[in-house]
Regions:
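Amphipathic alpha-helical interface elements
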Residues: 2-98, 123-126, 183
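Polyanionic, low-complexity intrinsically disordered segments
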Residues: 3-6, 19, 25, 35-51, ...
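Flexible secondary-structure boundary motifs
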Residues: 75-156, 160-180
């Protein structure tokens, strides 16, 4: 036994174990969880307002959860690009002065049959990455108050931009992209087909978690 163990130890001296992570799955999980938090806090916000309580603390919590959900959804799509992009796609893709979202969509279009979905994604990708970039590269601006999407009061523009509604849209886009890719790998792309098989369960799990969360806590607004 000692000899076997000794030989095994020596045999593994030159073996390297390589581990990789597709971080879009982790970012996707964060996005789904924080979108759920934003919706749950929205319900508290509306209830507090209905019973005459100060809504500002809940509004702030919704803002924070929505910022994380929106950013995480964008990070998930960015990480998906990082997993799927090839040197050829980088070489032939959009020019460097194009936004990150354009590079992501081009990569997906090259590896999956996105069809009409790609055209439908243009404005949604733009909105998501505008919000992500504005949060990461924030500027201080004095802007007029606007109605908060909850309907309880006016608030700062940032509260409207990073609201539960925007978090819902961000996560919807993320899962729309993931499900479209899982279901439509290009027949000629063996690696894309293998990706769809290998990650289909992860996408299904995220999608189911979101559906359960939304059934349990729908997004609400104050209706007076």
């Amino acid at each position: 036994m000692d000899k076997i163990l000794s030989d095994s130890a020596m045999a593994t001296d030159d073996i390297r174990i390589l581990i990789s992570y597709a971080l879009w799955s982790q970012w996707g999980q964060i996005a789904v969880e924080q979108e759920g938090t934003a919706r749950a806090v929205r319900a508290e916000l509306v209830a507090q307002h209905r019973h005459g309580q100060e809504p500002a603390p809940a509004m702030l919590t919704e803002l924070l959860a929505s910022m994380v959900a929106i950013s995480a959804a964008a990070h998930a799509l960015d990480a998906l690009y990082g997993q799927l992009v090839t040197p050829a796609i980088k070489k032939d893709g959009p020019k460097d002065d194009k936004g990150r979202e354009a590079h992501i969509r081009e990569c997906l279009k090259r590896r999956f049959d996105t069809g009409k979905r790609d055209r439908e994604w243009v404005s949604r990708f733009q909105r998501l990455f505008d919000l992500r970039d504005a949060a990461v590269h924030a500027e201080v601006k004095s802007l007029p108050a606007v109605p908060h999407p909850s309907g309880v009061s006016n608030a700062g523009q940032v509260n409207a931009d990073y609201s539960a509604e925007e978090a819902v849209k961000a996560v919807d886009l993320m899962l729309d992209v993931l499900n479209t890719c899982v279901q439509n790998p290009k027949p000629s792309d063996a690696e894309a087909k293998a990706w769809a098989v290998g990650y289909g369960r992860a996408v299904e799990t995220l999608t189911t978690e979101l559906r359960v969360s939304r059934d349990a806590r729908p997004l609400v607004i104050y209706r007076g």
